[in-house]
Amino acid sequence: LMAKDVTDGKSKDAGITKKMTVYTSAESHYSIPKNAAFMGIGREQVRYITANDLGEMQPAELEKAISDDIAAGYTPFFVNVTAGTTVLGAFDDIEAIHKICKKYHLWLHVDGAYCGGVIFSEKYNHLVKGIELSDSFSFNAHKMLGTPLTCSIIVTKHKEALYKSFSNDAEYLYQTDGDDFNLGKTSIQCGRRNDALKLWTLWKSVGNKGIEDMVNQQFYLADVARKYVQEHPDYELYSFENSISVCFNYKNIPAADLCTRLYEKAATLVGFGKFRETEFVRLITINANNTEEDILRFFKVLEENSSL
């Protein structure tokens, strides 16, 4: 919404009159086209950029799509970079994509809903190198940081854009001048729950080191799971290092069938995902309270309950 209003300052009052286009990875979250529909941009104006073999958006393909749209009379305005794709947990190259956004004067957003918590880890924050170059960044503390639902944060370097896009005068509200703490002026909601308290209490409770340890533990557990898969010939690994999504298949059993069996036997609950034409079991090590023993027990339970 901020990106739209920055690109077309009249659209907030007069409505959208330009053919505006959005760019995102083909592996990004479904909320991108959903929000394009809500805003009146239209799902058909979302351009899905192909990913490489690691699931990362390809900058060269992005620039080509932008250039082609400009030539066709469209108005590109927003590029979404994903920090932790839903299936593979891939991180798009922020720095490379920022250069393209700067060249074409586009708003760069980093969607860190899933794995944006890596900003708290000295060991893994390189995965979002260049995040300070973005115009906005969002992450869900109820994912990697484990706060209660819902606790979502958006950060932008354009404070004035928040006010221009979300403020709306009402005589019976906002009667104090200069109230920077009144989020009704800078967000869609007016009345709202104090969701920020969830992150604040966690931070006060465990501190920077505690949050960093939580994030690092999730990657450690993923390493444990990947090592197990790699060392056992009945498994085939489909994911990669530096991801908390561990994707694999077992004994060539269709992933959907295997996950359904485990669920129906009340053995364990794990989901499945798909990248390109391959479907696989998708183990997410996002619970920092788990241990190495819990991960190894998961595989034992899976193996014992995999047959019909």
Tell me the role of every PLM-derived stretch.
Residues 85, 104, 129-230:
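Active-site C-terminal subdomain of aminotransferase-like
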